Structures are given as C-alpha cells and as structure tokens.
C-alpha cells in the first residue's frame, strides 16, 4: 500500500516522547508535552512517536487517550506523520499514520492486519539477525537501530551498540529506511547518516533542550 508520507524522508528527524519525558518542567506534564511537541513541529521535526511508557507515564486511560489525540492533531496541523508506540488498538482508533513495535510486542504482520494496511509499521532492531528479519518482512516499513550510545530515556533499553553497527547493517544488504536511536546528540548526526542511517530518533536531545528551535535546526543541519 502507498502511504501518504515518504517513510525514508520521515526518518530524518524522528522525535519520540511522552509526558514522562517532560516532568522536569513546572506545569502539568501533558501540557508540557504538547508545548514541546508544537515547538519541535514548528522547528521542522519530520516524524513524531507518541510513547507514553514507564512509571511516570499517565495511568488514567481517559487522560492517556486525550493526550494522544491532542498530539495527533498537532501533527496533522503541521503535516508530520504521527506514530503510536506499541498500542495498536489506540493507533487504529485515533487514526495514527504509523505504529512502532518492539521485538517483544505484537508481530508486524498482526499489526498490519489490525490496521488494515492503513498504517506504516516500524520495529526495533538490536542485532544483525533482527535486521535481516525486518528486511525480509513485507509488513515492516522501517526500523529503529539502537541504542547507539548509552541512554537514560528508556527504562527497558537494550545493550548499547555502536555507530559501526549501522555500517554492518548496510553491509548485510539491509536497505529499508533505518533510523538510529539512543543517546544521540547534535554532533553525532552527520557521522550516523554517513554510515547509512536515514536519520536519527531523539528523546532527550529535544525534551532537555533549553532552546528547542535551535536544537532541531542543528539536528537537521
């Protein structure tokens, strides 16, 4: 199926966040997320993933869904793809553009079936074997590789890889759109793309920034 977004282009600067990532601000975390997301969208992020997970995430299902819808609406306003992490039922219900699943989440073929092909599907890759499986699975449209560097943003992060792993992925003829993730800073972007990544996914680089517009522009440089 043809998606309305070019996925390789969407991977250029992929922002991932939930309210748990913006609790360091003074006001309500849900409001904080919407503020940070809109600033990032205005500055030029190319994709956003709603990832509401962990001990500090919203626990109330009504508030959770309302926040997801508000994030989706912002993404639509700026014509940027809106991806939901793991929660396939939510993604289908609110009309997400994409769904991202980890290695222990629902298999991509089931995700594609449940969203009746209307969503693009991404998965997480931490080994060459997983990369080959993703490459050969017609239900996988892109994959995230990482963590490339140590990260504090994910409580359940896999073992740290290295930038060289991206080169190894491409050397194994794995050519689907690929985004690097995990502890990535502005200074790392050009090097990671030179090794074969289509772009970078970041959480704290944006959520911890004192000047979101400047940071996003630098990440896109």
Swiss-Prot record:
One Gene Ontology CC term in the entry: cytoplasm
Positions with a binding annotation for Mg(2+): 86, 105
Molecular functions (GO terms): magnesium ion binding; thiamine-phosphate diphosphorylase activity
Main EC class the enzyme belongs to: transferase
List of residues binding 2-[(2R,5Z)-2-carboxy-4-methylthiazol-5(2H)-ylidene]ethyl phosphate: 151-153, 183, 203-204
Record's catalysed reaction(s): 2-[(2R,5Z)-2-carboxy-4-methylthiazol-5(2H)-ylidene]ethyl phosphate + 4-amino-2-methyl-5-(diphosphooxymethyl)pyrimidine + 2 H(+) = thiamine phosphate + CO2 + diphosphate; 2-(2-carboxy-4-methylthiazol-5-yl)ethyl phosphate + 4-amino-2-methyl-5-(diphosphooxymethyl)pyrimidine + 2 H(+) = thiamine phosphate + CO2 + diphosphate; 4-methyl-5-(2-phosphooxyethyl)-thiazole + 4-amino-2-methyl-5-(diphosphooxymethyl)pyrimidine + H(+) = thiamine phosphate + diphosphate
Pfam families noted in UniProt: TMP-TENI
Binding site for 4-amino-2-methyl-5-(diphosphooxymethyl)pyrimidine: 49-53, 85, 124, 154
Pathway where it operates: Cofactor biosynthesis; thiamine diphosphate biosynthesis; thiamine phosphate from 4-amino-2-methyl-5-diphosphomethylpyrimidine and 4-methyl-5-(2-phosphoethyl)-thiazole: step 1/1
GO biological process: thiamine biosynthetic process; thiamine diphosphate biosynthetic process
Record bears the keyword Transferase: yes
Keyword terms: Magnesium, Metal-binding, Thiamine biosynthesis, Transferase
Manner of cofactor binding, per the entry note: Binds 1 Mg(2+) ion per subunit.
Superkingdom to which the source organism belongs: Bacteria
Entry cofactors: Mg(2+)
InterPro entries: Aldolase_TIM, ThiamineP_synth_sf, ThiamineP_synth_TenI, TMP_synthase
EC number assigned by the record: 2.5.1.3
Job description of the protein: Condenses 4-methyl-5-(beta-hydroxyethyl)thiazole monophosphate (THZ-P) and 2-methyl-4-amino-5-hydroxymethyl pyrimidine pyrophosphate (HMP-PP) to form thiamine monophosphate (TMP).
Family: Belongs to the thiamine-phosphate synthase family.
Name of the molecule in the record: Thiamine-phosphate synthase
Organismal lineage: Bacteria, Pseudomonadati, Pseudomonadota, Gammaproteobacteria, Pasteurellales
